[in-house]
């Protein structure tokens, strides 16, 4: 699935507010909607994955730099049993950007109680102009007659990124290396799962797929046409999704939204929990 911002374009047109093209105009749009009693942005922050993906998505540009990839390689190393915390190069800035985003969108403790139905209900009723969600939401609302588009994360450095999450992940038993027959069977299953036919079958109607297999052509529905350039620039961030990241993101980001932690305190708290 592909995540970013689901946007009610008709609301923008109704109130003559320009669609966002960068972070500054995104913030301006949020402020303009607030003046007419509409939430510019919200999301279902009762869920751990929304907390986690917002934190990472806002810093996708920085997390994919050389330093960011270096940290991620160390954190995700399957051969290492040592606990790895956050680095002191890339991650402090990620919490600064999260804190800035919270201020700019006026997120509060009330948003922590919002679930998916709450947020989509606000969007459907014209009470919220934008929310964090998947491109499937665009189809859902268009089918309901709401002029909806999909926009990327607007990084504060000017870049645009989208968040991707795997449909499935595969682990192969190391013992297969010693059993040729079983290994061949496992690879046959793997090849089928990664084939174009199989990937198109597992994709739900209206949902886009960005395949990591080079032999599967790019498939974008009309709902992603506004971020095609982002895809073509390969600005597709694959989320870090360890069990620790889910749990710690929920705890720390929730406290940031509630105003209980500064960016520095959040960085320290997150790091401490990863190392615990």
Where would I find each of the regions flagged by the language model?
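A structural signal for short loop-to-beta-strand junctions that line the ligand-binding cleft
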Residues: 1-10, 39-40, 154-163, 232-240
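Paired acidic/hydrophobic, glycine-rich loop segments that form the ligand-binding mouth/hinge
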Residues: 129-134, 149
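Conserved C-terminal helix/tail region of periplasmic/extracytoplasmic solute-binding proteins
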Residues: 13, 199-200, 228-276
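A local structural motif
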Residues: 14-19, 99-114, 127, 144-147
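Glycine-centered hinge/linker elements that transmit conformational signals in sensory
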Residues: 30-32, 73-112
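Periplasmic solute-binding protein
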Residues: 1-27, 38, 45-77, 164-174, ...
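Short helix-initiation/N-cap motifs at beta->coil->alpha
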Residues: 23-28, 109-124
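Extracytoplasmic/periplasmic substrate-recognition and gating elements
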Residues: 15, 142-205
């Amino acid at each position: 699935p592909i995540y970013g911002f689901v946007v009610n374009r008709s609301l923008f047109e109704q109130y003559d507010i320009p669609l966002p093209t960068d972070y500054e105009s995104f913030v301006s749009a949020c402020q303009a909607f607030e003046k007419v009693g509409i939430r510019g942005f919200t999301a279902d922050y009762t869920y751990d994955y929304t907390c986690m993906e917002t934190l990472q998505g806002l810093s996708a540009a920085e997390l994919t730099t050389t330093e960011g990839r270096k940290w991620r390689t160390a954190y995700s190393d399957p051969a290492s049993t040592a606990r790895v915390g956050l680095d002191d190069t890339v991650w402090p800035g990620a919490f600064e950007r999260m804190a800035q985003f919270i201020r700019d969108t006026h997120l509060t403790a009330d948003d922590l109680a919002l679930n998916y139905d709450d947020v989509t209900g606000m969007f459907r009723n014209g009470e919220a102009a934008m929310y964090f969600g998947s491109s499937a939401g665009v189809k859902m609302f268009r089918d309901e007659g709401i002029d909806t588009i999909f926009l990327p994360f607007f990084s504060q450095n000017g870049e645009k990124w989208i968040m991707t999450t795997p449909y499935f992940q595969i682990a192969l038993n190391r013992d297969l290396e010693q059993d040729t027959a079983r290994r061949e069977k496992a690879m046959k299953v793997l090849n089928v799962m990664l084939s174009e036919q199989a990937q198109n079958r597992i994709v739900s109607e209206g949902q886009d797929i960005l395949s990591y297999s080079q032999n599967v052509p790019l498939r974008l529905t009309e709902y992603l046409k506004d971020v095609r350039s982002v895809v073509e620039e390969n600005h597709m961030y694959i989320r870090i999704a360890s069990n620790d990241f889910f749990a710690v993101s929920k705890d720390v980001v929730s406290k940031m939204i509630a105003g209980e932690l500064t960016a520095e305190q959040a960085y320290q708290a997150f790091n401490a929990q990863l190392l615990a």
